[in-house]
Amino acid sequence: MFRKHFRRKPATSSSLESTIESADSLGMSKKTATKRQRPRHRVPKIATLPSTIRDCRSLKSACNLIALILILLVHKISAAGNFELEILEISNTNSHLLNGYCCGMPAELRATKTIGCSPCTTAFRLCLKEYQTTEQGASISTGCSFGNATTKILGGSSFVLSDPGVGAIVLPFTFRWTKSFTLILQALDMYNTSYPDAERLIEETSYSGVILPSPEWKTLDHIGRNARITYRVRVQCAVTYYNTTCTTFCRPRDDQFGHYACGSEGQKLCLNGWQGVNCEEAICKAGCDPVHGKCDRPGECECRPGWRGPLCNECMVYPGCKHGSCNGSAWKCVCDTNWGGILCDQDLNFCGTHEPCKHGGTCENTAPDKYRCTCAEGLSGEQCEIVEHPCATRPCRNGGTCTLKTSNRTQAQVYRTSHGRSNMGRPVRRSSSMRSLDHLRPEGQALNGSSSPGLVSLGSLQLQQQLAPDFTCDCAAGWTGPTCEINIDECAGGPCEHGGTCIDLIGGFRCECPPEWHGDVCQVDVNECEAPHSAGIAANALLTTTATAIIGSNLSSTALLAALTSAVASTSLAIGPCINAKECRNQPGSFACICKEGWGGVTCAENLDDCVGQCRNGATCIDLVNDYRCACASGFKGRDCETDIDECATSPCRNGGECVDMVGKFNCICPLGYSGSLCEEAKENCTPSPCLEGHCLNTPEGYYCHCPPDRAGKHCEQLRPLCSQPPCNEGCFANVSLATSATTTTTTTTTATTTRKMAKPSGLPCSGHGSCEMSDVGTFCKCHVGHTGTFCEHNLNECSPNPCRNGGICLDGDGDFTCECMSGWTGKRCSERATGCYAGQCQNGGTCMPGAPDKALQPHCRCAPGWTGLFCAEAIDQCRGQPCHNGGTCESGAGWFRCVCAQGFSGPDCRINVNECSPQPCQGGATCIDGIGGYSCICPPGRHGLRCEILLSDPKSACQNASNTISPYTALNRSQNWLDIALTGRTEDDENCNACVCENGTSRCTNLWCGLPNCYKVDPLSKSSNLSGVCKQHEVCVPALSETCLSSPCNVRGDCRALEPSRRVAPPRLPAKSSCWPNQAVVNENCARLTILLALERVGKGASVEGLCSLVRVLLAAQLIKKPASTFGQDPGMLMVLCDLKTGTNDTVELTVSSSKLNDPQLPVAVGLLGELLSFRQLNGIQRRKELELQHAKLAALTSIVEVKLETARVADGSGHSLLIGVLCGVFIVLVGFSVFISLYWKQRLAYRTSSGMNLTPSLDALRHEEEKSNNLQNEENLRRYTNPLKGSTSSLRAATGMELSLNPAPELAASAASSSALHRSQPLFPPCDFERELDSSTGLKQAHKRSSQILLHKTQNSDMRKNTVGSLDSPRKDFGKRSINCKSMPPSSGDEGSDVLATTVMV
């Protein structure tokens, strides 16, 4: 029954080469490999061989086939790596077992003691198996499919391992790492290993998750009922295995089979100087011709036959080629001009190459290497070498005329060739009459220099004279000599005068005169003063320079105008050679210039320097013509800057300040209470008053408290003592009244009574400014100097008039005064210049610098940093100039400032960008990208979230941070349809397309890649483009091509590209494989392609390809999130949607969909949803389409879709473990190989028996009949199995769009298809159709609604996957850039082989 299925086909060239290549890898010879491909009709020849030989050959072929299959199978499923676990800590404070008993006790005594237990003897056991959910439950009893191991005793009840390697468990694996796993870790008491594990169990923990091979550890912490265990795990591939499943094998090598190292992903990295798939091709020397050169070692350049040169780019001529070249082709002989023949050795232009005809004879080529000479009159011979008379050779040169001289003997002269014999064979003898023929000999050769006596050498000729006449030459003017060969030198006599140079000419001469003379022989004097008048070049240049210097100086407007006027007036037009002269006087051979004032030199072009010793006091002198100007330094004036400017003349000091004139400046001495450079600032130190009593006065040092008499101290805080003892108790007090006591006086004459009352004395006697004196009449006050009055209560004002000078402030005292002097003055009355500093003159740490009276320099303050002013009392604004960067706020004080930085920056001046990626906030091995005041995480496959904390394989990870049943990840779940999402105002760079929702403790994620980040996105804080931190250090931000903008203007966007060592920009970092990028996608089970035709006139402003792609991702995510989790199975891959303009078009977008996981069940679901989303029927509910396009520009890109074409591969139902599939396939192939072997063996046995006379025809016919019946049934079954690869999406597409999926052939085709199985294979599976080529803008929408559009799904029979074509729909005649596809009847396919590619075309 296997005979039909394994029937051999004629071997094509490609299959034969692949078979031979496989044979080479197994060490088989090409002969053996070729033998297995021979056609079947040659098999009967084997029957004639002995049976033993036939059996051996069949056995050897079968063994080779089985060995090839097994080697390929082993290579397919080979993998290697280690699962590693290290114990970090265990805490068992009670030393209890999990059952509550104590560690280290016999079973019969455990019930007697539960506290104060002995320490445990702790070891750990690891069980590793396939992934199991919590509902399934993880237990060691069900087996450890990935392996198990036990550590040695690590310690007591509680311990922390400083060296985690002590408690390490390593489980090697040789299968494809599944990424997901379940581990069970047990802590056991090793007191008595004979006890069952359940009685020795201290604690047990299990963990189920996903881990990718990496050198990084993942730490896990288990808090159990009895103990706490901290451990860490990781997976590492073996040394020569790579990628996430440890299945990529790469071993570095440097031998004849390859020269490469291994990359981080197992890719082969060629060593320096090698290239190719296996790096076995050497890179030749730079510039080595790739066709004509080769190399076995890097850097060499070995030429192939026929080529030479250091770079093998020089061809070699054919051997023996004489006058030819190879002309860019090896072993060629391309003849040069005038040469012919196979070896280019025949002269085709003998006349031009050799010039054989002498004496002006005309040469004519007659044949290769042949010629004929036509001689002039008087010449003859084969080469015109015979001279019949002397003038025939034109011996007279330079226009001379030859004349023959005859004599009495008129014998002719005969010229022969150089053989030296005449026609008669006699030699030629020299005579005196031959002296005129010397012109015929070569230069330097005498006539008697011939080798034979009596022979006259005439170059190649020899003369034989019998009776020869002579000739004479009549020379032209300027020539002389026997043959007019001598030029007469007319300059020999020196005809040129006054130093002129004589140049000899033919028949004359010419004199080149100096500039001062002219004439034929330079005899006439030139009048230089009569030269045409022209602008004085030197004067103009000087004028320009002078004007520039004047304008750049600090002259006043009046002085500036005068200087410019003087400079212009001093220049004039030139008089001949004199530029700035009064008169030009001609002299023999020369001239003299009478210069104007201020000018000198031969031509008066030099401006005399008038600035020597003129300007004073550091002024800058500007030299004019016969004049100068002084640009004075600051503080001086006058023509020579000799006068010091009195800056105090305008009284700049305010508020009564005294102005002190200085050099170039002034200084204000401010009165009490004022400060500043102009005394413009009032100093108020008495508000509020610091004096407790009395009144406050401002002083340069601060303030002064003028206290009342009974007070003393700086702030009048001290009380003066009172005098209460006699005799000071009365009479000396200003407040004594006459009613202090009562006295009655009685006289004899009257009876009146007088009463005097005296008040009790109080205060100081004599008001404290005098002494109380006693006298006969009573007490009185003797006042101190400066006071007066009965009780010395009046203070004499010594400050009136003011005795203080130079602005000093007078302070009245007790009988004296004090002068508070202004800065720079001192003395009792402030009349002396101060040379020293007084205490406290300079404030805030300033240093006082003494003055110098001889220089009128007063003491001044040198302020400390941060202070300024006359007394260093003014604080400098440290925040002036904005020292804080990046939006920082400056705060300052006296001599200091500090920056309060904005979020994301630090440092003293806020220039340091805070690295939010340190410490690492992203989880699960994600890549952290630092930003301004934040960070972003690029999650690895299988993770999502702001910090990649959501593990897609863990249903509860998205719900761990949620306080209720709905987590924060609900943005996409609340949208009812894709149109709602499109109208929410999302930007093109929205990264929320990949979101998770948490409902009732279970999470679901869209797991959709959101596109590359836009490195030209504007930062809301800095408002600057090219956001800092998006691109890494070795990357650059590459802006998107302008062609991707569908309708300008578009927002600027770009993506980060790696910068290669050659300074070239690498391709974008797309997660999808390059085989599924737009414009180069290969449609297969893991890659689908959609082609979208747009009407550009309906596309809204600002729409771009990436904007359309971002919108499609968001819309797809909104639909995927609604699907139940069971639709996608466990551990789905990441979906990737990529978009780009179709090559060569500007209105067609190619979109590819792929998954990071092979045979991902969500891929066909996503493709079906995209078909629904991009259908025009989805917009039926929009009543005002034009208004919607104006309001939402991004939707306009979708509403402008004219046609959608979808291509996908047929995806088989069901899924299984890839390792199991590989093993089952291997077993099946082995069984098939064994069956082939048995079949061949019995076939030969039957053939042998047939040849021996045995008749097996009935049984063979029956067997053939059964096989043909089985084949027909199989063909019918295959036809019935033909289904839509979009699976569930087809029904939803029909319900949502109202479109009919035509999955069966047309009725008329179906009827004919039932006639034979062959017709089933050749007829197309779709009816002919003819869509309109153009939709009218006004009626197109209605017609589209009325028309019953069809989505045609058909299997392309002749698709070529390598060229990325899909049958007849992608034929060269099809122009996808047009408005519609004209689906005519497709011709039947010519073959029954092809890849399973389905194409869907949607007309909208």
From Swiss-Prot:
Residue numbers spanned by region Disordered: 1-44, 417-436, 1267-1287, 1360-1404
Tissue and organ expression note: Restricted exclusively to cells of ectodermal origin.
Gene3D superfamilies noted in UniProt: 2.10.25.140, 2.60.40.3510, Laminin
Residues with Phosphoserine modification: 1292
Keywords, sorted A to Z: Developmental protein, Differentiation, Disulfide bond, EGF-like domain, Glycoprotein, Membrane, Phosphoprotein, Repeat, Signal, Transmembrane, Transmembrane helix, Ubl conjugation
Keyword Ubl conjugation: yes
Intrachain S-S bonds: 237-246, 250-262, 270-279, 284-295, 288-301, 303-312, 315-326, 321-333, 335-344, 351-363, 357-373, 375-384, 391-402, 396-473, 475-484, 491-502, 496-511, 513-522, 529-584, 578-593, 595-604, 611-621, 615-630, 632-641, 648-659, 653-668, 670-679, 686-696, 691-705, 707-716, 766-781, 783-792, 799-810, 804-819, 821-830, 837-848, 842-861, 863-872, 879-890, 884-899, 901-910, 917-928, 922-937, 939-948
Entry keyword annotation includes Cell membrane: no
SMART domains: DSL (SM00051), EGF (SM00181), EGF_CA (SM00179), VWC_out (SM00215)
Segments crossing the lipid bilayer: 1220-1245
Gene Ontology cellular component terms for the protein in this record: apical cortex; apical plasma membrane; axolemma; cell surface; plasma membrane
InterPro entries: DSL, EGF-like_Ca-bd_dom, EGF-like_CS, EGF-like_dom, EGF-type_Asp/Asn_hydroxyl_site, EGF_Ca-bd_CS, Growth_fac_rcpt_cys_sf, Jagged/Serrate
Sugar attachment sites: 148, 192, 243, 327, 408, 448, 554, 735, 961, 973, 1000, 1026, 1146
Segment forming the signal sequence: 1-79
Biased composition (Basic residues): 1-10, 32-44
Cellular location(s): Membrane
Limits of the EGF-like domain: 280-313, 311-345, 347-385, 387-485, 487-523, 525-605, 607-642, 644-680, 682-717, 719-793, 795-831, 833-873, 875-911, 913-949
Pfam families reported in the protein's UniProt record: DSL, EGF, EGF_DL_JAG, EGF_TEN, hEGF, MNNL
Stretches assigned to the Cytoplasmic side: 1246-1404
Stretches in topological domain Extracellular: 80-1219
Its job: Acts as a ligand for Notch (N) receptor. Essential for proper ectodermal development. Serrate represents an element in a network of interacting molecules operating at the cell surface during the differentiation of certain tissues.
Protein name from the UniProt record: Protein serrate
Species lineage: Eukaryota, Metazoa, Ecdysozoa, Arthropoda, Hexapoda
Gene: Ser
